[in-house]
Regions:
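Conserved small/polar residues in nucleotide/adenosyl-binding loops
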Residues: 1-4
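Solvent-exposed, non-transmembrane regions of membrane-associated and secreted proteins
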Residues: 8, 15-247
Length: 247
């Protein structure tokens, strides 16, 4: 009977040693995994924008993004004719419009125009949408705003260290030209401002008149995302509006 008790006691102690041994191995592994996860969640969001911005400087040696978008831009020459229609506007005045069915509206990610500011040495492909591919190859219209000629706010984004670096030289009175396949539009810069990235009063997407707003990260020599944005505001000077009604 004593022998049985001793044997049982040995089994119990052996069992405790096995459990302690497993705990000694498993607990440090779990602790390391938790520590890694916490550090990852804490630091990756901070470094990602910087890494992405630094990558912009080496983009020539990276993947070719030029084949990842559709180009529907066919410049309108001086001798070409864009189909138009004459109608009365809200004031009863005769006005010429670009026929709606002659406009090839861009899909998200399409290159559909060119944005030029001669005084700022800005000449960039204009995309509909402001995703990474668009901003690596030009500047992009926020998809929640409007295309030129549609009579609303055109909100255009570009990187401060590439295509929109020249905005630092923007001044009141300078002209901005946007070329599309259905017409060319001229805007005049009316104001510039530095505002917080979270300031929703910096733009009005519900405006019932055509206006152009261009923006980029600020300061211009900063890498990655910043807490400020540099805005350039412009009014429409010339260009045939699009007839919003189907023809």
């Amino acid at each position: 009977y004593k022998r049985q008790i001793l044997m049982s006691d040995k089994k119990i102690r052996h069992g405790h040693k096995s459990k302690n041994g497993k705990s000694f191995i498993i607990l440090p592994i779990i602790f390391c995994l938790i520590t890694y996860l916490v550090l990852y969640l804490a630091f990756v969001p901070s470094f990602s924008p910087v890494i992405s911005a630094v990558g912009m400087f080496f983009s020539d040696n990276e993947k070719d993004y030029s084949t990842e978008y559709d180009n529907i831009f066919v410049p309108v020459s001086e001798n070409s004719t864009v189909p138009t229609v004459t109608k009365k506007d809200s004031n009863g005045q005769e006005k010429t419009y670009v026929k709606n069915d002659s406009v090839q509206y861009p899909n998200y990610g399409n290159l559909f125009g060119e944005l030029i500011i001669n005084d700022c040495n800005v000449d960039a492909n204009l995309f509909f949408g402001d995703n990474d591919v668009a901003l690596r190859n030009g500047v992009g219209i926020y998809a929640g705003s409007f295309v030129p000629g549609y009579g609303g706010t055109i909100l255009v984004a570009g990187h401060n260290n590439t295509y929109f670096n020249g905005l630092k030289n923007a001044a009141v009175g300078q002209k901005v030209e946007i070329k599309t396949s259905y017409g060319n539009y001229i805007y005049e810069i009316t104001d510039t401002a530095v505002k917080k990235a979270t300031d929703r009063t910096a733009y009005d997407l519900s405006a019932d008149y055509e206006n152009l707003i261009m923006y980029t990260c600020y300061p211009f020599d900063a890498l990655g995302l910043t807490t400020q944005r540099y805005f350039v505001y412009a009014k429409l000077v010339s260009g045939t509006p699009i007839d919003k009604e189907a023809n």
